[in-house]
A protein has these predicted regions:
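Short, surface-exposed beta-strand-loop junctions and turns on beta-sheet-rich folds
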Residues: 43-45, 68-69, 76-77
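Rossmann-like dinucleotide-binding domain that binds NAD(P)(H)
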Residues: 1-35, 40-46, 106, 110-113
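C-terminal helix-rich "cap/oligomerization" subdomain common to oxidoreductases
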Residues: 31, 93-134
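Active-site loop of classical SDR/Rossmann-like NAD(P)-dependent oxidoreductases
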Residues: 78-92, 103
Length: 134
């Protein structure tokens, strides 16, 4: 379900050129999940791209750099994916399939509201509620 509230910390902390954010951490309260942690870090020299999901029944780990998927203590499952394949697939879908695999306009606007709330939270050092739910 939709995010309920979030708090964030982040910004431009490096000597990298430009003024875009290079580190951001979010803690979100979701409709059906009390705590979601999301981190973006362009300073990580090891180039990690990971998804870790803990539920009351399982732990799932997806490592996009090592091309490994793991559930609980099961052996790793290897998969094949080119580095930029997800981006190419997204653009191909937009051009050939009218974006049927992409998010809807309302979903995209919700992501933009979340980004705006994260920026406000980092600046104010406070929790932000999802205004769309009021």
């Amino acid at each position: 379900g939709p995010w309920q509230a979030l708090t964030a910390s982040g910004g431009h902390y490096s000597s990298l050129a430009g003024d875009s954010d290079d580190v951001f951490c979010l803690l979100l309260k979701m409709e059906r999940c009390a705590a979601v942690s999301l981190q973006m870090n362009y300073l990580d020299r090891s180039g990690r791209r990971e998804v870790l999901i803990n539920t009351d029944k399982h732990t799932y780990r997806l490592d996009l750099m090592k091309k490994e998927y793991k559930r609980d203590q099961e052996p790793d499952t290897l998969f094949s994916i080119e580095r930029d394949e997800t981006y190419r697939t997204q653009h191909t879908d937009m051009l050939k399939n009218h974006g049927k695999l992409c998010c809807s306009l309302p979903e995209g606007l919700d992501v933009l509201r979340m980004i705006d709330a994260a920026e406000k939270s980092a600046k104010a050092e406070s929790w932000q509620k999802n205004q769309a739910l009021r």
